[in-house]
């Protein structure tokens, strides 16, 4: 039913992506099986190969590091589903909330983590602990961290507010979604301004030993300010690395011609090929390209390529996607068999994609913001097998700060813009992970439904076209 040449080409990417849990077009399948030759104990959190007793329970290096970062940085996550997501080696990175929840439920002991965050627990004899449901809820909601931060011995200066932020998917005060969490007040910064020391820490010295986290996402300077010079430089470098030219894939179809499923599928394959090629070229132009190993770049691209492509389609190529590509899908009529066999997973992905298209049309993400979002998503230090996690985390934090600095400077009257933009990243990651599991023969119908719905709902609100985005309204909550 489907063109075999393109099916083989595209399905290879899909299958390799599915096998790694994040996506993977470049990692050899044998690479992840090296350590599976001998019988090993399994991590109690995700079932991966355990490396020892960490914070009281048998676990792998990945869950050990995740638990340590979550507790040390006092991160507060959120689950977009029913707080009961599957935890496996392939699925563990898709929901940080459920991963931390299982760490606590299995008995990982946060008191075994050194306060300075350095390697080596405070007491290696400490075993698993039993935590009440109430205490777990306090930790997951961030209330436990707030209570600790409000203790008198942890106050700082004359500013009684000790609420700070750090990169991560979370929720803020007032139950407002935000990718932030609080840090202990001995690392506090003023909420209503920006200190030179903090800027130098993040942007001026990428390899500094100790990093303070961002000012609170909702704490904005009272007076108008200029963009920090190094933020301007770093953003300029990211934008320069992008190929923002229109996609070269032909999309024009003669009037009256009916597009077949095979033809539409072949077009989607060519689009995926071109977009993937652009991501590979983008990596070579990154300002930090020489700072990381080829092995780490390979793993990062393998894990994030589908997310990068989806982000590009939602932003810099959205006008072309909702224009030329939507016109092609409009000329395709699915058969009754295709309609009846469309899966529940496909329906879920369709609804989430429609929501994201509308959300990005509401935000009108600029090229500068897109470039920062892309770099932040790419620099994912939670991916298995990376050789320089510390440096990746430092680079990630740098571009978090740069993006926040830019949005606060460019959109001073939109105080929630930065957290709204950042909260789109876990949504993209979730959808991309589900998209690679959709049967290939269902993709033409999926994209037809998504683009038809988006174009129909947005056309009545569109007042002008843009090379980056198209104006529209937000979806109803």
From Swiss-Prot:
It comes from the Eukaryota. Residues 40-115 bind DNA. InterPro entries: NHR-like_dom_sf (IPR035500), Nucl_hrmn_rcpt_lig-bd (IPR000536), Nuclear_hormone_rcpt_NR3 (IPR050200), Nuclear_hrmn_rcpt (IPR001723), Znf_hrmn_rcpt (IPR001628), Znf_NHR/GATA (IPR013088). Expressed in germ cells, being predominant in previtellogenic oocytes in the ovary and in spermatocytes in the testis. Residues 156-187 have a biased composition (Polar residues). It is found in: Nucleus. A zinc finger (NR C4-type) spans 43-63, 79-98. One of its GO terms (biological process) is midbrain-hindbrain boundary development. The keyword Transcription regulation applies. SUPFAM superfamilies: Glucocorticoid receptor-like (DNA-binding domain) (SSF57716), Nuclear receptor ligand-binding domain (SSF48508). Keywords: DNA-binding, Metal-binding, Nucleus, Receptor, Transcription, Transcription regulation, Zinc, Zinc-finger. Residues 147-187 are annotated as: Disordered. Residues 230-461 form the NR LBD domain. Disulfide bonds: none annotated. One of its GO terms (cellular component) is cytoplasm. GO terms for molecular function: estrogen response element binding; hormone binding; nuclear receptor activity; protein homodimerization activity; sequence-specific DNA binding; zinc ion binding. Belongs to the nuclear hormone receptor family. NR6 subfamily. Probable orphan nuclear receptor. Binds to a response element containing repeats of the motif 5'-AGGTCA-3'. Homodimer. This is Nuclear receptor subfamily 6 group A member 1-A. The lineage of its organism: Eukaryota, Metazoa, Chordata, Craniata, Vertebrata.
């Amino acid at each position: 039913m489907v063109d075999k040449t393109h099916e083989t080409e595209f399905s290879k990417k899909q299958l390799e992506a599915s096998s790694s849990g994040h996506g993977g077009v470049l990692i050899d399948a044998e690479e992840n099986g090296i350590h599976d030759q001998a019988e090993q104990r399994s991590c109690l959190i995700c079932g991966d190969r355990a490396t020892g007793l960490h914070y009281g329970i048998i676990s792998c290096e990945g869950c050990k590091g995740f638990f340590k970062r979550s507790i040390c940085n006092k991160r507060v996550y959120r689950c977009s589903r029913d707080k009961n997501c599957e935890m496996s080696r392939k699925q563990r990175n898709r929901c940080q909330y459920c991963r931390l929840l299982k760490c606590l439920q299995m008995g990982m002991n946060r008191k075994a983590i050194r306060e300075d965050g350095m390697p080596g627990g405070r007491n290696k004899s400490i075993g698993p602990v039993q935590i009440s449901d109430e205490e777990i809820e306090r930790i997951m909601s961030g209330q436990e961290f707030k209570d600790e931060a409000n203790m008198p011995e942890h106050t700082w200066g004359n500013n009684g507010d000790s609420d700070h932020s750090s990169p991560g998917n979370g929720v803020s005060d007032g139950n407002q979604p935000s990718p932030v969490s609080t840090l202990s007040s001995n690392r506090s910064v003023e909420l209503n301004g920006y200190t030179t020391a903090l800027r130098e820490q993040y942007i001026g010295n990428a390899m500094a030993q100790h990093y303070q986290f961002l000012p609170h996402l909702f704490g904005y300077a009272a007076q108008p300010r200029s963009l920090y010079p190094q933020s301007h430089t770093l953003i300029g470098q990211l934008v320069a690395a992008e190929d923002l030219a229109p996609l070269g894939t032909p999309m024009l179809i003669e009037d009256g011609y009916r597009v077949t499923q095979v033809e539409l599928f072949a077009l989607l394959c060519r689009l995926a090929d071109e977009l993937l090629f652009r991501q590979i070229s983008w990596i070579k132009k990154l300002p930090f390209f020489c700072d990381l190993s080829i092995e780490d770049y390979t793993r990062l691209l393998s894990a994030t390529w589908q997310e990068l492509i989806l982000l590009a389609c939602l932003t810099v190529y959205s006008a072309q996607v909702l224009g030329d590509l939507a016109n092609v899908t409009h000329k395709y009529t699915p058969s009754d068999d295709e309609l009846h066999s469309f899966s529940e997973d496909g329906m879920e992905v369709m609804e989430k994609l429609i929501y994201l298209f509308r959300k990005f049309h509401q935000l009108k993400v600029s090229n500068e913001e897109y470039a920062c979002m892309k770099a932040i998503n790419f620099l994912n230090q939670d991916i298995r097998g990376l050789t320089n996690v510390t440096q990746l985390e430092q680079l990630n934090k740098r571009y978090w700060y740069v993006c926040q600095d830019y949005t606060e400077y460019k959109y001073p009257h939109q105080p929630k813009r930065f957290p709204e933009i950042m909260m789109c990243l876990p949504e993209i990651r979730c959808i991309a992970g589900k998209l690679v599991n959709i049967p290939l023969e269902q993709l033409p119908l999926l994209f037809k439904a998504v683009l038809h719905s988006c174009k129909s709902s947005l056309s009545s609100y569109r007042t002008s076209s843009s090379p980056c985005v198209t104006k529209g309204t937000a979806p109803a909550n």
